[in-house]
From Swiss-Prot:
E.C. number: 1.1.1.37
Protein residues bound to substrate: R81, R87, N119, R150
Family affiliation: Belongs to the LDH/MDH superfamily.
GO biological process, one term: tricarboxylic acid cycle
Protein name (Swiss-Prot/TrEMBL): Malate dehydrogenase
Residues at the catalytic site: H174
Cited InterPro entries: L-lactate/malate_DH, Lactate/malate_DH_C, Lactate/malate_DH_N, Lactate_DH/Glyco_Ohase_4_C, Malate_DH_type3, NAD(P)-bd_dom_sf
Keywords: NAD, Oxidoreductase, Tricarboxylic acid cycle
Lineage: Archaea, Methanobacteriati, Methanobacteriota, Stenosarchaea group, Methanomicrobia
Gene: mdh
Length: 307
């Protein structure tokens, strides 16, 4: 049976554990630095199993040693965005947290695959890779699945159709410079560009780019966690089941899309060994330009880090 460890027992981490438990993908360890928090949430989720009908083993702990021999580790630790705070504002605090988390992953689960969820996503994923010392394909970030889901949701709302029929694609940095791709977005196989005029698509793209901030402003405290946890679990399932799904993820680029040595949201094939392949899509010039701006922002931030 697979072993999955979730670092961080906040809203995103605990909701991820709930979804993993309900799917019975493997035994789960949830760890957090706050005493009692992971233990209490684990106990609650264990008792929920009697009602929902799952027998998943769930351990809540403050001890990193419990993640030993994990097949998959999901990082959700760190502080969340507050109203008016950009993802880049998070870098100083979260980079230190994730460096420490990553060193413990390397110590106790050296053969694991790592999915990072902590923001600023692309930069923190780079820190996780460097701090673990793992192969780049074994460390990747959850970004595009969430952003694509938001894009798909807005499209379904606009067209008054089922979300099940929308296949959306968003690449680029996880932040203000993400790149939704209408030409690779379909509704039951029909290109979005055949269904909506450019101005309406542009409004949906703008709302997608601001999707996380919109929720932060409404909540006043904290940020989204239902959709992020759903996105995390879709990626985790692809790894645990070795299903070779094509999903957008923040992956390490080595010449792909003209970029070198950074993490960036791109379509990838996910399986038991992590990122098994990066798919290159043809983009128009404006999309390439946005990617270049996004990558430059990430690169400049990384150059200022002390790793």
């Amino acid at each position: 049976m697979a072993k999955i460890s979730v670092i961080g027992a906040g809203n995103v981490g605990a909701t991820t554990v709930q979804r993993l438990a309900e799917l019975e993908l493997g035994e789960i360890v949830m760890t957090d630095i706050v005493e009692g928090l992971p233990q209490g949430k684990a106990l609650d989720l264990i008792q929920a199993g009697a009602i929902k009908g799952y027998d998943t083993s769930i351990i809540g702990t403050n001890d990193y040693a419990e993640i030993v021999d994990s097949d998959l580790v999901i990082i959700t630790a760190g502080i969340a965005r507050k109203p008016g705070m950009t993802r880049e504002d998070l870098i100083k605090t979260n980079s230190k947290i994730i460096a420490e988390v990553s060193r413990n992953i390397a110590k106790y689960a050296p053969d694991s695959i790592v999915i990072n969820v902590t923001n600023p996503l692309d930069i923190i994923t780079y820190i996780a890779m460097k701090s673990t010392g793992f192969e780049t394909k074994k460390v990747f970030g959850m970004s595009g699945v969430l952003d694509s889901g938001r894009f798909a949701s807005f499209i379904a709302e606009e067209l008054k159709c089922s979300k099940k029929d929308v296949q959306a694609m968003v690449i680029g940095g996880h932040g203000d410079l993400m790149v939704p791709l209408p030409q690779y977005t379909t509704v039951s196989g029909v290109p979005l560009t055949d269904l909506l005029p450019g101005d309406r698509i542009a409004r949906l793209v703008e709302r997608t780019v601001n999707g996380g901030a919109e929720i932060v402003e409404l909540l006043k405290q904290g940020s989204a966690f239902y959709a992020p946890s759903a996105a995390i679990v879709s990626m985790a399932e692809a790894v645990i089941k070795n299903s070779k799904r094509i999903l957008p993820a923040s992956a390490y680029l080595e010449g792909h899309y003209g970029q070198e040595g950074i993490y960036f949201g791109v379509p990838v094939k996910l399986g038991a060994s992590g990122v098994e392949e990066i798919l290159e899509l043809k983009l128009d010039e404006s999309q390439y330009e946005t990617l270049r701006k996004s990558s430059e922002t990430i690169r400049n931030t990384i150059s200022q880090l002390e790793i």
